[in-house]
């Protein structure tokens, strides 16, 4: 066994370039895993700066706009959009969330009436003991949800201070990262291993693919949210922005997200309209929008993305989401692509 490990090491990891690549990745993983909470503002600023780099480079290289001016224009536009989101959309989402929570008791009573009628209408399928069991189970779930909501509210109040600090630090760090990009990269390169050519080569190969994926995913979220919001408005569905926002975020979790988000959409439509033609119109329109997203929008936006097996994508979402939460889910596919590229970069037999 020991000889096999030595043989594998000599074939795969004896190359100094491969060791340099693994050292960089290992350092990054350990830093994020153990110190992620401490360096979270830095990581957020780094990711957002990376996203803004493409429009800045476009203004700088193709329109001959000085980098400082391009940075100010793009950064200012980003701050403006962020202000609109937090000052306009977030209050609307909050109000619809409060409205949904206040309507939950009425929904619960309506579901009780519906369940109580089942033994009368279908005595051969369900009896009153089964209905009582369902009532007790739902009641326990609601009580547990209420306790969680109270804890979450208290935690949210405590996190307001952190949010205020982030709101100041992140834009400040973003601006200096964008303005002084060259100087910062030169400073960071001094701490990297000397045998880093392989790592740089792999990064250059993947950089465009990762950039295309991130921008494509953000565009997909925007398009899906807008389309579903229009659908919900047309049919007069309650909480349209809240549900549309949830549908938009569901694209971050491939395959699983679409299934999960269908449940609240269907339940809200059912409680509002019952089993009526309007209910089925909403379900059909929503299903068509999901089919168009999966079969038309995704292939168009991600035609340049590295092809990964669906099982690998799901496993990546579970692993990286478990490690790093929201950001792990968002970057699951780029990280899986990175792992694949690293494996391919190691010396072969």
Curated annotation (Swiss-Prot):
Record Pfam families: AI-2E_transport
Segments passing through the bilayer: 24-44, 72-92, 157-177, 221-241, 251-271, 282-302, 311-331
Protein's organism: Haemophilus influenzae (strain ATCC 51907 / DSM 11121 / KW20 / Rd)
Protein name in UniProt: Putative permease PerM homolog
Keyword Membrane part of the UniProt annotation: yes
Location in or out of the cell: Cell membrane
A single GO cellular-component term on record: plasma membrane
Keywords: Cell membrane, Membrane, Transmembrane, Transmembrane helix, Transport
Protein's GO biological process: transmembrane transport
Membrane topology, record value: Multi-pass membrane protein
Family: Belongs to the autoinducer-2 exporter (AI-2E) (TC 2.A.86) family.
Keyword field contains RNA-binding: no
């Amino acid at each position: 066994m020991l000889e096999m490990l030595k043989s594998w090491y000599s074939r795969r990891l004896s190359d100094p370039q491969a060791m340099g690549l693994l050292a960089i990745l290992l350092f990054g993983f350990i830093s994020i895993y153990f110190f992620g909470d401490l360096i979270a503002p830095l990581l957020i600023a780094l990711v957002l700066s990376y996203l803004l780099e493409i429009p800045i480079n476009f203004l700088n290289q193709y329109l001959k706009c000085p980098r400082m001016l391009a940075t100010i224009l793009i950064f200012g536009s980003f701050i403006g959009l962020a202000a609109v989101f937090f000052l306009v959309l977030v209050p609307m989402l909050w109000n619809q969330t409060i409205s949904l929570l206040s309507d939950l008791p009425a929904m619960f009573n309506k579901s009780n009436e519906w369940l109580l009628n089942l033994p009368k209408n279908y005595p051969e399928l369900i009896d009153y003991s089964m209905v009582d069991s369902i009532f007790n189970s739902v009641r326990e779930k609601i009580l547990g949800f209420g306790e969680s909501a109270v804890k979450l509210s208290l935690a949210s109040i405590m996190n307001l201070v952190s949010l205020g600090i982030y709101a100041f630090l992140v834009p400040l760090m973003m601006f200096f990262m964008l303005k002084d990009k060259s100087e910062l990269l030169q400073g960071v390169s001094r701490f990297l291993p000397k045998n880093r050519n392989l790592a740089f080569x792999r990064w250059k190969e993947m950089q465009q693919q990762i950039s295309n994926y991130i921008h494509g995913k953000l565009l997909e979220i925007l398009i899906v949210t807008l389309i579903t919001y229009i659908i919900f408005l047309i049919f007069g569905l309650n909480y349209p922005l809240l549900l549309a926002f949830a549908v938009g975020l569901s694209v971050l979790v491939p395959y699983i997200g679409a299934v999960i988000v269908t449940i609240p959409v269907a339940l809200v439509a059912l409680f509002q309209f019952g089993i009526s033609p309007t209910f089925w119109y909403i379900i059909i329109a929503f299903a068509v929008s999901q089919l168009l997203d999966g079969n038309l929008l995704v292939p168009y936006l991600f035609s340049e993305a590295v092809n990964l097996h669906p099982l690998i994508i799901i496993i990546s979402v579970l692993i990286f989401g478990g490690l790093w939460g929201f950001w792990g889910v968002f970057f699951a596919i780029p990280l899986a692509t990175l792992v694949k590229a690293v494996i391919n970069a190691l010396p072969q037999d």
